């Protein structure tokens, strides 16, 4: 599961209407409905209730992953200590260095490099991350802590230019061009259309 408990500031192509605060009754119900098949959950650890969620995930053998997060460096390091050991699609929907009142604040990306045992995913489709960042990631992270992912969505493998992301009940229109899926305003990617072999070739 990716969401529902993510940062609106790092939502990317996620449906803003489906972003929620941690709700124990809700995530207990989701886990129960999954009947033991829920193996990983990607959330933003800076949100209130993330610690309680971490305990719940551990009790239910669910791998915790950081995704669509605006957390600062210290928050990620603390999250790592309580069980958040994975980062979903590094650089995509992740905070990085920002300036606040003149001071630089490190984020998820910097913590990913600092924490040797933090696993990271990379969308190596040739679009989401330039070759320079792929080189940096593979130089600073050990191979056993890097996972290639497609992050592919609906139009993958189809000869279409227009499609949608999310539920058909509340679709987010997307356009396919330049080898990637984009939001209609072209200000952000909506997902990948890559297959696994493309990641290896990149």
Q: What positions do the PLM features span?
A:
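A general structural signal for short secondary-structure boundary/capping elements
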Residues: 42-50, 113-114, 132-134, 196-198
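His/Asp/Glu-enriched, well-ordered alpha-helical/loop segment
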Residues: 104-122, 126, 138-202
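Active-site glycine- and acidic-residue-rich loops that bind
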Residues: 46-48, 61-72, 122-139, 146, ...
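Histidine/acidic-residue-rich, glycine-tolerant segments that coordinate divalent metal ions
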Residues: 2-105, 157
